[in-house]
From Swiss-Prot:
GO annotation, cellular component aspect: membrane
Keywords, comma-separated and alphabetical: Membrane, Signal, Transmembrane, Transmembrane helix
Induction, as annotated: Expression is down-regulated when the stress-activated mitogen-activated protein kinase (sakA) is deleted.
Encoding gene, per UniProt annotation: ltmS
Taxonomic path: Eukaryota, Fungi, Dikarya, Ascomycota, Pezizomycotina
Protein name as it appears in the record: Lolitrem B biosynthesis cluster protein S
Length: 283
């Protein structure tokens, strides 16, 4: 195993540990095996239990009802969370499953879903990324997608998730400039960088707990997904006896910072595949 492999595997271990410590310090369970019936139970007991569940649905029906009942207080980050999550899951399925293997796509999605259901997305993404980094070497990175379809797929993810990420932050920034006293639901301190104090604002403490856990999952899980793609890019370069340059790393970091981890991941894979495919075409 190369030095860069160790670096990216260590990064995934760091994200996994960071997610566990972060959740533990804020009172969320590290491992949870809730009853499946709680997905359809909207009783008060289930709603109370939902304050600590790690899965992004947190008893999906109850959580969505809680978000709806609390109006716009938690909508902005939820939209950001869903866009990044969907984009990264599609990228992971693209990387782990050859084109057209729908059953294997379902198996990979089910494995990631069960891990997230029991240990939370902030832990599941790093664990899943560790498996990918250990199983897929550079010579196996490019899937059987036709080149035109692959570029269209990655560019679609890049633009859709990137525009949503930038647009959501623009809404939060405008709301912050218009309401500097942090009383607006879309204020960046209430929506993206933190959660509102529901003892002072008209929102539910349970919904705030859900939102805080989504923020933990989004910050650690999506960072894990982005560095997974950077690790795969590094493997592809090593197969060509090349290494990541400082200029390329700075570019990848700023794309991820501005357009979001999902768009950053798509950009990394487009860059990687342009290198590996071009050599095959020349050969």
């Amino acid at each position: 195993m190369s030095r860069s492999d160790w670096i990216f595997i260590s990064l995934q271990g760091f994200f996994c540990l960071a997610g566990v410590i972060w959740k533990s310090r804020e009172g969320y369970p590290i491992i949870d095996f809730p009853c499946p019936l709680q997905f359809i139970d909207s009783s008060d007991a289930t709603l109370s239990y939902g304050t600590t569940s790690p899965w992004f649905g947190f008893r999906a029906v109850a959580s969505m009802q809680s978000i709806w009942d609390n109006g716009p207080w938690f909508w902005l980050h939820l939209m950001l969370y869903i866009a990044q999550l969907v984009g990264l899951i599609l990228i992971i399925l693209h990387e782990t499953v050859p084109h057209g293997a729908f059953l294997r796509k379902f198996e990979s999605l089910a494995a990631l879903g069960y891990l997230s259901y029991t240990v939370g997305l902030s832990t599941a993404f790093p664990v899943f990324s560790l498996w990918i980094l250990n199983q897929y070497r550079a010579e196996k990175l490019v899937t059987a997608w036709p080149r035109r379809q692959e570029k269209a797929f990655l560019r679609t993810i890049f633009w859709c998730t990137g525009i949503s990420h930038i647009g959501i932050f623009m809404v939060a920034i405008v709301a912050t400039l218009l309401h500097r006293d942090a009383t607006a639901p879309f204020h960046i301190g209430n929506s993206l960088l933190g959660v509102p104090d529901c003892s002072q604002f008209p929102c539910s403490e349970i919904a705030a707990r859900h939102a805080r856990l989504r923020q933990i999952n989004e910050m650690t899980g999506t960072s894990s997904g982005f560095f997974l793609t950077v690790g795969l890019f590094s493997q592809a370069l090593e197969a060509e006896n090349k290494h990541l340059s400082l200029r390329v790393m700075v570019r990848m970091f700023f794309v991820s910072l501005i357009a979001g981890p999902a768009a950053g991941s798509a950009d990394v894979l487009l860059l990687r595949d342009s290198i590996t495919r071009s050599k095959k075409d020349c050969g």
